[in-house]
Every structure is written in structure tokens, then in C-alpha cells.
């Protein structure tokens, strides 16, 4: 990491059949980004040229970057076949997979400090023979890390308060969640979260709210036994192991998000925690997307470099129409630059 210059970010195009190229062109036209980072896109100039021509033909007033003038690492994969806008397939999956891997290779080689990824389609990856659950798992595999997690960060445009949420489990069926949750898993995720808060946000003595699994956190075993069986005992041990953190919970899931809702919408000074640890995908992401859909950013913690991405998908249904919003991608770029800057600051002891 080069702490003597502006953060060096590499931005992938994501699936070229989705809204990735559109939101990348819109983000690169955003004034002010050049003052906070050195931003390089990685992908195919032909894809960006075609996207720009198509969008401007529909709406000449769109503010789009010119592919001929942006910093671009060319990865020409046109030989793989034709891209059909709005339709993810084996061709678009192979291309987006190649974009990501080239970005990882360059970052691991020290050319960049952070990767910002536009969205991909898991179905397109699978059609191309790449059977990863998502970009997060590819990043972890290529970086050689076994302990990693998905965290979501959003800053309220109303109050300035920042919501930080980590998922203990991610893309697994709901019926598998109780078996996947173990004290060992929770310890690993909590350690990642505490490291992230200290390293990336400068919060060395955080408060962390931890959700229960069952309605009313099991209501003393009447609505589920996981809290009594292991979650409460685990929390008691965790409080001893991590005295620097205030660990609150297990909190009934239906009330854990009341404080964040108030802090996000009306009162940034209300009583809230520095971070929220949700036990499964929808428990954490329904409130995140309800409050912060256009501002929420996915960041992978546990990697040796910064990675962020917008918290939305490829949106094939609106690709090529010029109506995709770049807010989340712009926020992802800004957050990546902030996290790189934070990692360059001396850590408080």
C-alpha cells in the first residue's frame, strides 16, 4: 500500500450484459472523485464505447464518461463471443470472471490498494463453468485467506450516522442456518469485525449489537433453544475474551433495528451501536436495504487489501435503458478511498 499518494483503486465493469458498464460510466463522470483517489477501470473499451453510444442515442443529456479519456486497463475478450445486453449467459459470465481475476492479480502485485467491483451474475458464472457463490469467495481464494466476512456500510444522507452490519452466515438456505451457526464461527466473525472496526474505522473500543436467532431471542427457550444452548454462553465468554468491546445481546431481531432506524432517518445522536452482527442473510440485509438501499456498500473484511462493491445486482431487466443509478457505486468508490486512507493512519493503542 502506497501511503504517500492518493489511494489507487481499480474498478471492474462487472457483467457486461448488466448495468455494470452504465453505472461505471456514470460514476467516472462524477466530479470530485479525482481529488480523493487514482481510479482505473478494468474491462473492454469496446463494451464501454457501445454502452455510451446506446445510452446517448436514447438520452443525449446523460452525463457519461468518455471511454477514450478515462484510465482503462484493456481486457479485450471479444473473441469469447457476442454480449447480449440484458441477458447474462456463459459469455458475459466468462468476461466478468476474467475482469475480476485480472483486478485481483494486479492488486496482489501491488499495483493497486483497493478493488471496487461492479455486480456479476452467479448464474452467468455457472454457465461459464465458474462455480463460486460470488465475487467474495473468489477474492478470498485468490488472496489465500480462510477467514473472511461480508460487511455492509452505509452513511445516512439525513443525519450523517453510519450503519455497519456484518453477516455471520451469507448465501445459504434458511433451513441450514441453525446448523451453520456455532461458537467457533461466531468467534471468527466477531474477531474479523473488531479488527475491521479498529483498522478501517479507527474504533478500538466499539459497542457491538448481536442479534438472537429466534423470535424474542427464544424467550428463555420457549420459542427456540439456540440462545439458551450456546449463544448466551458464547457471549459470556466473548465478553471476557474481548474486554475492549461492549458486546450487547442476544437482542430480539425485531427490535434490534429500531435504534438504527431512528439514527438513520431523524436523529444521528440516538443510542446506537458501532456495529451490528446479524446471524443470517435476510436478518441483516432487510433492514440495511430498507434504510440504505442507495447508500449501502458491501465490503469484504479479512482480505489483505480493501474491497468494496455496490449493494445491488446486475439488474438485467433495466440494462441498456439509461435509468440505472450510480449512487451506490459512487459511494463504494468513496468508501474504498476512505478505508485505504484509514489503514495508512497510525493505529491507536
From Swiss-Prot:
Subunit structure: Homodimer.
The organism of origin for this protein: Synechocystis sp. (strain ATCC 27184 / PCC 6803 / Kazusa)
Gene Ontology MF term list: 4-hydroxythreonine-4-phosphate dehydrogenase activity; metal ion binding; NAD binding
Reactions mediated catalytically: 4-(phosphooxy)-L-threonine + NAD(+) = 3-amino-2-oxopropyl phosphate + CO2 + NADH
Binding site for a divalent metal cation: 171, 216, 281
Protein encoded by which gene: pdxA
Location(s) in or outside the cell: Cytoplasm
Pathway: Cofactor biosynthesis; pyridoxine 5'-phosphate biosynthesis; pyridoxine 5'-phosphate from D-erythrose 4-phosphate: step 4/5
UniProt record similarity statement: Belongs to the PdxA family.
Needed co-factor(s): a divalent metal cation
Pfam families with a match to the protein in the record: PdxA
GO biological process: pyridoxal phosphate biosynthetic process; pyridoxine biosynthetic process
Residues noted as binding substrate in the record, renumbered to the chain: 136, 289, 298, 307
EC number: 1.1.1.262
Transmembrane segments: none
UniProt-listed InterPro entries: PdxA, PdxA_fam
Entry-linked NCBIfam families: pdxA, PRK02746.1
Protein name, entry field: 4-hydroxythreonine-4-phosphate dehydrogenase
An annotated GO cellular component: cytoplasm
Miscellaneous section: The active site is located at the dimer interface.
Keywords from the named record: Cytoplasm, Metal-binding, NAD, NADP, Oxidoreductase, Pyridoxine biosynthesis
Record carries keyword Membrane: no
Note describing how the cofactor binds: Binds 1 divalent metal cation per subunit.
Free-text function comment from the UniProt entry: Catalyzes the NAD(P)-dependent oxidation of 4-(phosphooxy)-L-threonine (HTP) into 2-amino-3-oxo-4-(phosphooxy)butyric acid which spontaneously decarboxylates to form 3-amino-2-oxopropyl phosphate (AHAP).
Amino acid at each position: 500500500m502506497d501511503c504517500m499518494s492518493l489511494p489507487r483503486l481499480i474498478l471492474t465493469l462487472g457483467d457486461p450484459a448488466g448495468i455494470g458498464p452504465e453505472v461505471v460510466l456514470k460514476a467516472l463522470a462524477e466530479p470530485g472523485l479525482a481529488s480523493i483517489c487514482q481510479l482505473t477501470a478494468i474491462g473492454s473499451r469496446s463494451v464501454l464505447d457501445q454502452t455510451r453510444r446506446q445510452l446517448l442515442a436514447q438520452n443525449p443529456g446523460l452525463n457519461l464518461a468518455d471511454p477514450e479519456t478515462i484510465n482503462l486497463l484493456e481486457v479485450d475478450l471479444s473473441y469469447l463471443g457476442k454480449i447480449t445486453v440484458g441477458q447474462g449467459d456463459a459469455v458475459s459470465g466468462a468476461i466478468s470472471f476474467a475482469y475480476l481475476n485480472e483486478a485481483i492479480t494486479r492488486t496482489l502485485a501491488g499495483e493497486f490498494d483497493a478493488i471496487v467491483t461492479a455486480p456479476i451474475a452467479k448464474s452467468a458464472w455457472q454457465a461459464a463453468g465458474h462455480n463460486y457463490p460470488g465475487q467474495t469467495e473468489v477474492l478470498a481464494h485468490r488472496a489465500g485467506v480462510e477467514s473472511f466476512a461480508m460487511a455492509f456500510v452505509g452513511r445516512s444522507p439525513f443525519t450523517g450516522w453510519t450503519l455497519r452490519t456484518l453477516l455471520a452466515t451469507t448465501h445459504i438456505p434458511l433451513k441450514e442456518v441453525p446448523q451453520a451457526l456455532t461458537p467457533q464461527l461466531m468467534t471468527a466473525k466477531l474477531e474479523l469485525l473488531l479488527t475491521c472496526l479498529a483498522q478501517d474505522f479507527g474504533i478500538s473500543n466499539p459497542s457491538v449489537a448481536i442479534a438472537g436467532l429466534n423470535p424474542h431471542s427464544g424467550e428463555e427457550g420457549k420459542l427456540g433453544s439456540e440462545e439458551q444452548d450456546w449463544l448466551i454462553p458464547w457471549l459470556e465468554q466473548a465478553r471476557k475474551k474481548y474486554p475492549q468491546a461492549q458486546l450487547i445481546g442476544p437482542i430480539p431481531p425485531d427490535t434490534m433495528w429500531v435504534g438504527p432506524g431512528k439514527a438513520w432517518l431523524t436523529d444521528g445522536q440516538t443510542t446506537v451501536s458501532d456495529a451490528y452482527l446479524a446471524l443470517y442473510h435476510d436478518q441483516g440485509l432487510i433492514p440495511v436495504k430498507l434504510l440504505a438501499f442507495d447508500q449501502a456498500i458491501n465490503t469484504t473484511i479479512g482480505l489483505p487489501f480493501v474491497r468494496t462493491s455496490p449493494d445491488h445486482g446486475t439488474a438485467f431487466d433495466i440494462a441498456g435503458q439509461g435509468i440505472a443509478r450510480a449512487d451506490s457505486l459512487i459511494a463504494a468508490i468513496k468508501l474504498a478511498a476512505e478505508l485505504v486512507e484509514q489503514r495508512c493512519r497510525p493505529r491507536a493503542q
